[in-house]
Amino acid sequence: MKKILVIGATGKQGYAVVQALLEREYSVRAFTRNKENERLKALDSERLEIFEGDLNSEDDLRDAMSDVDGVYSVQPINRDDVQVELQQGRNIMKSAKAQGIEHIVYSTAGGVNRDRTGPHFEILAQLENELTDSDLHYTLVKPSFFMDNFLRIVQKDENHLYIPEFITPDIPFAMISTRDIAQIALHVFEHPQQYDGQSLEIASDELTLNQIVDTFETVTGVPTSIRGTFTSGTAERSWLEEKGYKVDFDLMTDINPDRLTLDRWIARQQW
């Protein structure tokens, strides 16, 4: 039975990976700053080990990587000091090399190393380059827009749903659920040689904002429209509109044939 270390195990993405691995009968070591994390403890699996550690500590990382077959890493964003992100990523790679890890699946973001600007994305690009230049067996997974973001940005007001305009409404963009990120990671761990050294920009659907509005209304039966704006910055919106995510959807179907398109994802939520 393979054992996988999941770094970032309490975040939405990492937690989904932990769940997917456990469902497929893997053993999982979940790396967290708090061993008493209620979400992890609620999984209540004899194949789950909760490991308390600090990404700033190479000793903690080496201990966490002992006797594991692979590593899934999704690092937390540090908005106060991106250099902390850089050093933590380097700690992960250095520890993986020291422990002879068979395969590391490293999650960054769609568009990294493809003109996506901003301190966080530039640090991720640097880490991608250092991983690519290392001797490690790795796969980069680069998620597109998170469908899960809609849980945060969609507003409900008197039986009406409102989605803010964060992109020109007739421009298509790719998106994915954390559930599907986990399924793709699982597939990579099951076929490590096939994806060794590859960079995968991943998604499960591609729609315009106008189509998203129509999809929400059709699935929920609740009138839906665009209201207000939401953006993490002018540069980020410009990148999404002018460059955007680049996803091979034929490959996505091969890797994840049961992928959640937006309508299927919406149907799983409470609105």
Predicted regions and their residues:
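Oxidoreductase cofactor-interface core, primarily capturing Rossmann-like NAD(P)-dependent enzymes
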Residues: 2-40, 56-59, 66, 76-86, ...
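Rossmann-fold cofactor-recognition segment
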Residues: 44-56
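Short low-complexity, flexible loop/linker segments enriched in glycine and/or proline
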Residues: 44-47, 120-121, 155-156, 240-242
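General small-molecule cofactor/ligand-binding pocket signal
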Residues: 49-51, 139, 225-229
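Short, solvent-exposed polar/charged micro-motifs at secondary-structure junctions
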Residues: 61-62, 150-151, 233-239
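Short secondary-structure boundary segments
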Residues: 75, 108, 228
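A hydrophobic C-terminal alpha-helical subdomain
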Residues: 219-271
